[in-house]
Each structure stands twice: as structure tokens, then as C-alpha cells.
Amino acid sequence: MNLLAKTRKLNTMLQQEASTHVDFKVMADRLSEVMESNTFIVSRRGKLLGIAIKQQIENARIRGFLEERQFPEDYTKKLFNVTETTANIAIDSEHTAFPIDNRDMFETSKTTIVPIIGGGERLGTLVLGRMLEDFNEEDLVLAEYGATVVGMEILREKAHEAEDKARKKAVVQMAINSLSYSELEAIEHIFEELDGNEGLLVASKIADRVGITRSVIVNALRKLESAGVIESRSLGMKGTYIKILNDNFLYELERIKSN
């Protein structure tokens, strides 16, 4: 299969996987299939976003990295110091993706490192490994193309995360703004009592201590629940179980209290 055919195959496979959720495992599988190599999509912090093993590496330390889906910090830093595509790295190099403690088994191995760049910043690293064959120029073209696509997907996921965070923040602000003064006061006391993201409380006890009616507490909780900020469930005489669903809620509540 020539370069054009491989590029088209890779492009088709990656486009088929395009969705609102970025699946880096699938992307690694697709790259591994076309590149015929072990493939690791590594984040800036060394997290293994996607792994595809074409040629098994029987080594306990490497197996541990794969199970934890995390490269060691020192190796991650070494990857980050590689600022341009570096091909056919030997087993003796500190950048090899193969276990140097089994040097004899992997003496013909080749590692290729491709920085993942997007939006003008380093987003991660694409690491490829083969047991025997060198990576040729066509392989490197494909690898750099693959790294570009992965970079675009990382940026897309970051954008989705930012949108989700902004939406959650807006929902919390709207929910809190819908509360009356007495309801807001009740909510502040409730979550001081809760001391965490979930727990059990007795509304009548809080109402008596703060000097408000139980109905104010019930109405306040109902407003937050209808906005999807919290989940509540009556446990009868035991009280009411409350769980915070929106992780922006406590921050916004604290911000309002401090103003």
C-alpha cells in the first residue's frame, strides 16, 4: 500500500470515529493499524490517552505503566523535551519506548516520537514503537499527519470541556439568583451543615436553629433540584439525603457569602 492509499485509509478511519466524544483509544488503534506499530497517545502530564499494542512487550514495569495508563514523570519530561519528530530511536536512548532492562530482547527495536501541537502549544506526544523495521519517510509523513489529527481532537475536547464548565457555572448562577433572600440564607446554612458534597440533614432542626420555616428550606431545595444542581431524597424520620451534582455550586455559594 503506497503513501496516498495509507493516508486515505487513515483519514477515512479517523473520520468514521468523529463524534462529540473523542475516543483516543480508537484513534490509537487506527494509527497502530496503518503504522503497524505500538502506538501511545500521551498527554502533557504523561497520561496515556490512547494505547494500541501491535507487538507485545513482556516486561512487568511496562505492563504496570499500561495498566495505570500513565508514563513515569521523568520519561514524560524527556518526551516533552523532544520538540520535533525524531525517528528510529535505538534501545540505548533515554527516549526509547522499550524496556532497557531487557535490552537483549529489544536490541533491534525502533522508537519514533512526534510532538502533538495544536493552537500553537504542545498538547502531548505521539510515541510509536516497532520491534524490527525502521520507520521510513512515508511512515513519518503518516505519523505527523496522525499527530496533527490527534492535536485537533485534543483541542476539540478542551473546547467541549470549557463549554461544559461555562454551562454548569451559568446554571448554578441562575439557580442561586432564583432564590429569595430567606431561601438563600437557608441554603447557606444547609450546606454548612452538610460539610461536603453529600450527606443527610434534618430540615426541621435547621429551621428551628436558624429561625426560618421548614417550607422555606423545602422550596429552596426544590429550586436547586429542578435546576439539576442537587439531588435530594426524603428518608422519612431520618431526614433528607442531599447530593451536589454540579461541582461549581459550593464555589459560587461561597463567593456570594464572601461578597
UniProtKB/Swiss-Prot annotation:
Please give the DNA-binding region boundaries: 203-222
Q: Name one GO biological process term.
A: negative regulation of DNA-templated transcription
Q: Name one GO cellular component term.
A: cytoplasm
Q: Which Pfam families match?
A: CodY, HTH_CodY
Annotated disulfide bonds: none
Q: Where in the cell is it found?
A: Cytoplasm
This entry's Gene Ontology molecular function terms read:
DNA binding; DNA-binding transcription factor activity; GTP binding
Q: What is its main location?
A: cytoplasm
UniProt keywords, alphabetically: Cytoplasm, DNA-binding, Repressor, Transcription, Transcription regulation
Q: Where is this region: GAF domain?
A: 1-155
Per the record, the domain of life is Bacteria
Q: What does this protein do?
A: DNA-binding global transcriptional regulator which is involved in the adaptive response to starvation and acts by directly or indirectly controlling the expression of numerous genes in response to nutrient availability. During rapid exponential growth, CodY is highly active and represses genes whose products allow adaptation to nutrient depletion.
Q: Which PANTHER family match?
A: GLOBAL TRANSCRIPTIONAL REGULATOR CODY (PTHR40062:SF1), GTP-SENSING TRANSCRIPTIONAL PLEIOTROPIC REPRESSOR CODY (PTHR40062)
**Which NCBIfam families does this one have?**
codY_Gpos (TIGR02787), PRK04158.1 (NF003170)
In which family does this protein belong, per the annotation? Answer: Belongs to the CodY family.
Annotated protein name in UniProt: Global transcriptional regulator CodY
The organism encoding this protein is Exiguobacterium sibiricum (strain DSM 17290 / CCUG 55495 / CIP 109462 / JCM 13490 / 255-15)
Q: Which gene encodes it?
A: codY
